[in-house]
């Protein structure tokens, strides 16, 4: 049975993914800053590790087979937290994973992280951080999957997606539940390694990935 470390397990996507993996009777190590945010998760398959990502969190990787990095500084923080969490904590996670010989590292990135220079909005620092974190993973020795969701919504999971960017930016959206279901699917498909793709709501079944 695989054991998955979810970094940022108290965030919306991280928590949804934790629940989905647990529902499939898989072991989950949930890395969070405040374990009280997971009070509604109760399973013998769940291990909660409480640790600030700005500190050393390498111990959380012990005994894990794969990692999902779903942490983020949040939209209400400044550029300092963007650097420390979205870039530096992600880089540290990749380094820790290499030391622990993790079999598969899944990074939740963002649309636009491929080319932050093309963006001229307040999102640019965030996308630069995501770009650098993604590049560090791609240049590592790890098997990886980088998922770059479009604009996140709170719609229910349609279980149908697209990896082709829509012509209209207004259509470049994906529900958080769809993202969580994609991560769960990938975590159970060993062939899904060393791939980078954007993710949107669409018409293709998740199993088409």
List where the protein language model places each region:
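N-terminal Rossmann NAD(P)H-binding glycine-rich loop of SDR-like oxidoreductase domains
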Residues: 4-24
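Active-site beta-alpha turn of Rossmann-fold NAD(P)-dependent dehydrogenases/reductases
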Residues: 71, 106-109, 150, 200
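Glycine/proline-rich active-site loop of Rossmann-fold NAD(P)-dependent oxidoreductases
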Residues: 156-161, 186-195
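Substrate-positioning beta->alpha
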Residues: 90, 170-185, 195
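Flexible, glycine-rich beta-alpha linker
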Residues: 148-164
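Core catalytic loop region at the nicotinamide-binding pocket of NAD(P)H-dependent oxidoreductases
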Residues: 189-209
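Conserved Rossmann-fold NAD(P)-dependent oxidoreductase catalytic core, especially the SDR/UDP-sugar
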Residues: 27-29, 35, 77, 81, ...
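NAD(P)H-binding glycine-rich loop region in Rossmannoid oxidoreductase-like domains
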Residues: 5, 36-92, 96-99, 187-188
